[in-house]
Structure formats: structure tokens, C-alpha cells
Amino acid sequence: MGLKNLFEKMEPAFHKGGKYEKWYTLFEATYTILYTPGTVTKKDSHVRDALDSKRMMILVWLALFPAMFWGMYNVGGQAILATSHLGSLTDSIANNWHYAFSEAVGATLTADAGWGSKMLLGATYFLPIYLTIFLVGGFWEVVFAMVRKHEINEGFFVTSILLALIVPPTLPLWQAALAATFGVVVAKEVFGGVGKNFMNPALAGRAFLFFAYPAQISGDLVWTAADGFSGATALSQWAQGGQIALKHAVTGQEITWMDAFLGNIPGSIGEVSTLMLMIGAAIIVFARIASWRIIAGVLVGMAATATLFNLIGSETNLLFAMPWYWHLVLGGFALGMFFMATDPVSASFTNKGKWWYGALIGVMCVVIRVANPAYPEGMMLAILFANLFAPIFDYLVVQSNIKRRKAKAA
């Protein structure tokens, strides 16, 4: 008997009145991940598409894999480089289970480590964070689905990996669990669940950590997974000393634009490589999951605002001089632009609204980065701010169309 036949034989027991009725949500989620649902349209439908929401979310999830794998490689590489510089490898193996496990399975943790060893060490940091977020957030998804008696939506595949990619590799697991809980319960389920949340759940979870536990989500101690190592992000370095201050904290070598573009710098796990994020973005834009209008709007808004600050200039604030192409590759700008600003639920729906929504994100990101003396990153707050304005943009566009048609018909 094939697996599909086994599922079909078991299915009646999970429907209403069946022995396992209360577990239908879990049965349906498992079946529809493996196979296309057997449901058919009984009445007129507004949209027909071969790509259902389940496949769409899984495709976005897969599109984040390039950034995820590079993030693991970079985390491991930065950690090995730092421990080699500090001469603390022996202490790290003795006191840090990530290093001890990696060495036990054959990884080389010295300066001549290969890509496999770097990937393995990075995976020991990323995978526990991701699994914690996935399991805790998934638990809340299942609880609310069972209480409301509806299907489990695969949107959490995307939320979980995004949240795991926008945090430092040293984040405590209990804080990852709290972030997942806040993102799923407070930012999504409280407002009715999938399709009804007005803000991005992953960003809401990170914002919760930023305001509740700033020491573990910002500063100089959290970006490199090496005990006792301190190193500022490239954005913080620019804020303190301008472009000339962009130096690798370990080697002292200059950080070039290409280093930042490829992702050879410390930072949140999945936001460092603009190249890998572009590869994933090409997939979801080509599949028409992400709106190119939003991406273009963000880019135009950022470039225009950065250029304006360049023209104004400042002798005391060195971020005024940062060109737009540096804004693109530093911090969380690329990840936010490609995968968070384009969230179809919390973004604007109308075509014109998408342009204004994207432009607002680009403008606010640069304004927060440059004009905020306490925190040189602005993409998270910019997107959450724009989420609040997305319905307003759509309303104004619709009202404008109504007025234009009335005037034309008069």
C-alpha cells in the first residue's frame, strides 16, 4: 500500500464525527505538505492559480536557503578567525559546546579551517535557534488552528526562518522562544491569524527582543560567536569614524564594498550577504510572489534620501556621507527589502500603493540610520512603520480612482 493510499484510508477517522476528529488539523497539514489537496471549487471563484498558498510559502522558504547557508558559513568563519586571533581555542572547546561538538565530529577549528568546518560550526549556532523558533512558533500555530478549527497555514515556514536569520548567532534560545511567541501570538493570531495581521510577525518578534533585551540583540559583543570577543558592525564603525573606519575587528584589514556585498563581515546570521539575498529574491520575483514595485520603491526611496543627505553634509554626523550603494549592502537593508517589505499580507495591495509603501520604507530606513544617534540600523523600524501606513495608501489610491472615474463619467 502506497503512502497516499494509507492517508486516504485514514482520512475518514479525522473528519467530523470520526474517532480522531480533534486531530484533523495535524492530519491535514501533514497530508497537504506531501500531496496536492483533493478539494475542488464548488462555486465561482475570483482567482485560479496553479500555485496555492502552501506551495507559495514553501517556495519563499526555499528562496531563503542561499542566505541561510551562507549565514552558517560566515558565522563559523568569523568565529574561527576570532578564536585564532585571541588564542582561545582550547578554552572555547572546554567551555563552549558548539566548539566541543564541532571538534568531536572532526571539524578543524584553526585558522586553516576549510569551508566544511566553518559551515559545521556555524550550523551549531544557527540550527538550535531555528529549531527553537520553529517548534515554539509551530506549537502556537497548531494550538490556535485547533481552537479555531481551521487548517494550519504554512506561512510559519517563512516566519520562522526569517526570524532566525535576523538575530545574532549568540542569541539565547529562551529569548528566541519568546520572540517566536510574540511574533505568532501577539503580532498575528491576536488579530485573527493568517491574512489578518497588519505587521510582519518576524519583524515584530525581533522588535520585541530589541526593546526587551537590547544587550543580546545589539552592541559589540553579540555578532561574532567567540567568547570574549568584541567587534562592532560595519554600520556602527561608519557611524563612529566614517568609511575610513571600516576595518575587520580581527585582522584590521579594510572592509571593502565587495566584502560587504558578498557577506564577509559580522552581523545577523542571514542579512550579511546581499548577493545570496539577490539570488533568493530573483526566485520569488520571477514566481510573482514578491512585488517588484515594492522592491523598486524601497530602492528609489533609499537612494534619493541617501543622496539628499550626501548633498546636505555634516561635520559631526559621518553617516550623512554614506552613499546609497553602501546603504544597500550594510545592515539588514537587503533582507528587509526583498523578503519583509514584500510580505503580501502587511504590504499595500494596490499597484500605486506599493510604490508609495516601498518608497516610505526606503526613506525611513535612511532617516533612522542617519538621524538617530543611538542606533545606526533602521530597516526593522522602517518596515514596521510602513506597515501601519499600507492600508492608508491603498485607501487613498482607491478613492483617487473613484474620483477620477466619477469625473470622467460626469
UniProtKB/Swiss-Prot annotation:
Keyword Secreted in record: no
GO biological process, one term: sodium ion transport
Family matches, as InterPro entries: NqrB, NqrB/RnfD
Keywords: Cell inner membrane, Cell membrane, Flavoprotein, FMN, Ion transport, Membrane, NAD, Phosphoprotein, Sodium, Sodium transport, Translocase, Transmembrane, Transmembrane helix, Transport, Ubiquinone
Pfam families per UniProt: NQR2_RnfD_RnfE (PF03116)
Catalytic reaction annotation: a ubiquinone + n Na(+)(in) + NADH + H(+) = a ubiquinol + n Na(+)(out) + NAD(+)
Membrane topology qualifier: Multi-pass membrane protein
Cofactor(s), names only, from the UniProt record: FMN
GO cellular component: plasma membrane
Primary location recorded for the protein, binned into one broad class: membrane
GO molecular function: FMN binding; oxidoreductase activity, acting on NAD(P)H, quinone or similar compound as acceptor
EC number: 7.2.1.1
Membrane-spanning intervals of the chain: 56-76, 126-146, 156-176, 267-287, 294-314, 319-339, 355-375, 378-398
Subunit annotation: Composed of six subunits; NqrA, NqrB, NqrC, NqrD, NqrE and NqrF.
Function: NQR complex catalyzes the reduction of ubiquinone-1 to ubiquinol by two successive reactions, coupled with the transport of Na(+) ions from the cytoplasm to the periplasm. NqrA to NqrE are probably involved in the second step, the conversion of ubisemiquinone to ubiquinol.
Database matches in PANTHER family: ELECTRON TRANSPORT COMPLEX PROTEIN RNFD (PTHR30578), NA(+)-TRANSLOCATING NADH-QUINONE REDUCTASE SUBUNIT B (PTHR30578:SF1)
UniProt name for this protein: Na(+)-translocating NADH-quinone reductase subunit B
